Amino acid sequence: MIKIYDTLTRSLREFVPIHENTVNMYVCGPTVYNYIHVGNGRSAIAFDTIRRYFEYRGYTVNYISNFTDVDDKIIKAAAKAGMTTKALSDKFIAAFKEDVAALGVKPATENPRVIDYMQDIIDFVQILVDKGFAYESSGDVYFRVRKSDNYAALANKTLEELEIGASGRVDAESDCKEDPLDFALWKAAKEGEIAWDSPWGAGRPGWHIECSVMATTILGDTIDIHGGGADLEFPHHTNEIAQSEAKTGKKFANYWMHNGFVNIDNEKMSKSLGNFITVHDALKTMDGQVLRFFFATQHYRKPFNFTEKAIRDAEINLKYLKNTYEQPFTATVDEAVFARFLEKFQAAMDEDFNTANGITVVFELAKWINSGHYDQTVKDKFAEILQIFGVVFKEEVLDAEIEKLIEERQKARAARDFTKADAIRDDLAAQGIKLLDTKDGVRWMRD
């Protein structure tokens, strides 16, 4: 039984899908105006791991992750670069796909782009206006927050707390709003900006409405899981809930999941703070699989401090698992003991996808394998578990010359010619091949 920590209820809840053996997930993707930073990469890795574990447990997963390609940041970045907004978005969508592929993230079932859903967005906003949940003002359209029941429940706040937080903050939209808490569904076009015709004049959608429209258009009025970074709880996901449920009269998502921040020197990594490392740059000096495994060692909801030491530790641990995976088979495998490892792993991961505890079990299993319990069945299951964390090892094939040297050393040992055997061992070590003599025969690993 899989349990999920639901941000909305602040509780661990048993996962019950809307449709049997199927998971419909929507995860907020990047605003494509720059390379993603490592914090964005963690979100992609976290939800890919969750997706993979659902699949490991036998579910079919419809995994939708959008590209926000209509946004103020894109307009500004495109103008600065002397590019069209579409050309800029296309560039960074391609970069995103390349970066997350290097992190072992599977392609989404679908990556919707805002630009392809403009009429759906306009229709959605019109319904909210018709139902009295939204109003037009000077070409903008705003959502009436006070008409929404339990508006800020996801953020665990009251309207009074939001009002206090908003006091003293006056923006260019304030004079157009009925209430300072109201948020934009549609923005009137400014001169020179990309725009679409609508019943309220030329303009473009607000950020929050975009995800509501894409999620419900593709997956239906109610989805199983909606995910994203913890920074999206308010206002983005809060506003998504308000506008979606106002339109449909139904619950928008049954489970809300949020991954923790990545910190640099114990401070949240973000583009606004200027303390970020892009995945694009990180991959120039470290292996994507190492970076991914680094994040898997911490529970997805917890903040993570990005340090060089932690990366080095992840690299060492991955090397150990690789050497374990490449071991030759042994004669003895206790199926009952192996089954208990699998049960223990599942119990760890069923508890809100606790990768930290799950990986602890993986290393216990590796230790058992290295003590002489390995056959094809164990190897196949070991590989299946590792791929949940994006770890896929290619089969190492020794070239004929090295195979011949190992065989010659075995013959020398059998003839008790230990001088020759040691010389061959040293020759192999110089080529990066480490030999281990065990009761089950010789084993080798890349050093």
UniProtKB/Swiss-Prot annotation:
Binds 1 zinc ion per subunit. SUPFAM superfamilies: Anticodon-binding domain of a subclass of class I aminoacyl-tRNA synthetases, Nucleotidylyl transferase. InterPro entries: Cys-tRNA-ligase, Cys-tRNA-synt_Ia_DALR, Cys-tRNA/MSH_ligase, CysS_C, Rossmann-like_a/b/a_fold, tRNA-synt_1_cat_dom, tRNAsynth_Ia_anticodon-bd. Transmembrane segments: none annotated. One of its GO terms (biological process) is cysteinyl-tRNA aminoacylation. Signal peptide: none annotated. GO terms for cellular component: cytosol. Monomer. This is Cysteine--tRNA ligase. The gene is cysS.
